[in-house]
């Protein structure tokens, strides 16, 4: 089970704590932040991108495929119809057959974070005593 704690002491800069890892999230200057770290949607995209490349690396390892460097570029946008979309574009430094590429696209659609985002998730919110 994943667990993260976020601490906010001043403006929009947030301390994100996950086990022994620490990072800062913030809003860009244009939104009143200090741009001291990725914005929340950038962290969401980073989660999806990391899960994608990890899953592809695991799958390729089991198949004996050499992918080389994996690059996953992601872009979030909300259309005028309020429809939210994430565009995920993957590239590999090693040559792959069209069949391998098609299979990797299929596998990317089955990563844990992809499934969570695609299904939606219930969020229970409360105030601690």
Language-model-detected regions and their locations in the chain:
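Extended beta-strand/beta-hairpin segments
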Residues: 1-46, 54-129
């Amino acid at each position: 089970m994943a667990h993260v704690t976020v601490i906010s002491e001043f403006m929009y800069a947030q301390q994100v704590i996950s086990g022994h890892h620490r990072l800062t999230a913030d809003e860009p200057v244009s939104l009143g932040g200090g741009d001291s770290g990725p914005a929340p949607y950038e962290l969401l995209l980073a989660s999806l991108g990391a899960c994608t490349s990890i899953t592809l690396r695991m799958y390729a390892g089991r198949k004996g495929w050499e992918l080389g460097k994996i690059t996953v570029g992601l872009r979030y946008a909300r259309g005028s119809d309020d429809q939210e979309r994430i565009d995920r574009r993957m590239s590999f430094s090693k040559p792959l057959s069209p069949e391998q590429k098609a299979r990797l696209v299929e596998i990317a659609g089955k990563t844990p974070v992809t499934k969570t985002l695609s299904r939606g998730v219930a969020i229970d919110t409360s105030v601690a005593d």
